[in-house]
């Protein structure tokens, strides 16, 4: 029966006014901290009164300019930039290993790791290099025998050290970026209205002196990413050009501006001895008069640039404002919970506070006191006396 009677109970809030300097100061201090947090961080910093659009739409067009000298040849954009379409990802070639006049046929591998003594060492279990292994061990030179392959001959020798194209440090990259936030139908580009043709021809990006110039010097990008140009050009690498659009659309249109930052994206591979840097191969194909095909194979080392666009926009909306305001007012009640814990467990007179805060009333009690007024009877029997706890009042009988 006790379980049943305990189940069918009802609890209601009882207000007790405690006149204590200690608990009063704690209560107001906690409330002040909560209000300061919501006003300073939630509303002013995080702008919780705004609805945000993070689905940024972006297009990037790039153009590289500059001339360099490599292997006694003057190189222009068509020679050292790939792909040529001017996309958000492109490579500036800084070093090349060239293998000319390759034709289909049979020839020995030229690397020391394919050294052999007999045909049994050139079986299919051996990892192929420049072509398909034929299973024969043939003479590479008068002192070296290597496994024979079928493929493009002669095979590539990529262990030679080649110079880098130092002029690439002064090449320029023009970036044209257009963005749109579809939720607000807001569009803008990195070519700001105050930029003229004259400005674009002579300006160079600098984070402080020219933060909105769309023309970037390659050497500056490498430096801003914390890299050394000579080392990066020799091994190759991947750099990120980040364009951030974080816009408060409650402000003027011209306050939404791009912010550029730079980083190396393949930092992990840089530290690896297995495959450091960035390189790739491509070939140029030709035909002789008799119809035979031959090619020039190029192993290119270069700096790959990834233009990464990110951002979000916010604008005032009544719904998030109401939700954040309700959360702020509700959170103020946390101070009451903390003060109750201190009041009922740590202050002097805690037992008296508990007796006044928690009171159990049963039907038997109500029937026994029906002939009297319990409120006045309780008040007459109550004597207030001041405790020694910072002006707190406890209630005694």
Curated annotation (Swiss-Prot):
Intervals, Cytoplasmic compartment: 1-20, 342-397
One matching Pfam family: P2X_receptor
PROSITE patterns assigned: P2X_RECEPTOR (PS01212)
One term under GO cellular component: presynaptic membrane
Residues bearing glycans: 139, 170, 194, 290
Cysteines paired by S-S bonds: 107-153, 116-137, 122-147, 203-213, 247-256
Protein name per the record: P2X purinoceptor 3
């Amino acid at each position: 029966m006790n379980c049943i009677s305990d189940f069918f109970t009802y609890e209601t809030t009882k207000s007790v006014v405690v006149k204590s300097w200690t608990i009063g100061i704690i209560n107001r201090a906690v409330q002040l901290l909560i209000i300061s947090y919501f006003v300073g961080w939630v509303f002013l910093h995080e702008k919780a009164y705004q609805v945000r659009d993070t689905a940024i739409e972006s297009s990037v067009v790039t153009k590289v300019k500059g001339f360099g000298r490599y292997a006694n040849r003057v190189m222009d954009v068509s020679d050292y930039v790939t792909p040529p379409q001017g996309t958000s990802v492109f490579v500036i070639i800084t070093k090349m290993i060239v293998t000319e006049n390759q034709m289909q046929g049979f020839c020995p591998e030229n690397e020391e790791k394919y050294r052999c003594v007999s045909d049994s060492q050139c079986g299919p279990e051996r990892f192929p290099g420049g072509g398909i292994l034929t299973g024969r061990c043939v003479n590479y030179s008068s002192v070296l025998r290597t496994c024979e392959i079928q493929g493009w001959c002669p095979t590539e020798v990529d262990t030679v050290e080649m110079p880098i194209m130092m002029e690439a440090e002064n090449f320029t990259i023009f970036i044209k970026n257009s963005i749109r936030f579809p939720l607000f139908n807001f569009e803008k580009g990195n070519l700001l209205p105050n930029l003229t043709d004259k400005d674009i021809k002579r300006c160079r990006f600098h984070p402080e002196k020219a933060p909105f110039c769309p023309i970037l010097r390659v050497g500056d990008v490498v430096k801003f990413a914390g890299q050394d140009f000579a080392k990066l050009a020799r091994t190759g690498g991947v750099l990120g050009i980040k364009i951030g659009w974080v816009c408060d659309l409650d402000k003027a249109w011209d306050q939404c501006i791009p912010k550029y930052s730079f980083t190396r994206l393949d930092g992990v591979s840089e530290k690896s001895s297995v495959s450091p840097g960035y390189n790739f191969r491509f070939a140029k194909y030709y035909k002789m008069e008799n119809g035979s095909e031959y090619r020039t194979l190029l192993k290119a080392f270069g700096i790959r640039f990834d233009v990464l666009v990110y951002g979000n926009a916010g604008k005032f909306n009544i719904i998030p404002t109401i939700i954040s305001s309700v959360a702020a007012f509700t959170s103020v009640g946390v101070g009451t919970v903390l003060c109750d814990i201190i009041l009922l467990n740590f202050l002097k007179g805690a037992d008296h506070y508990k007796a006044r805060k928690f009171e159990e009333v049963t039907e038997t009690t109500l029937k026994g006191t029906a002939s009297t007024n319990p409120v006045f009877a309780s008040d007459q029997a109550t004597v207030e006396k001041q405790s020694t706890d910072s002006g707190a009042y406890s209630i005694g009988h």
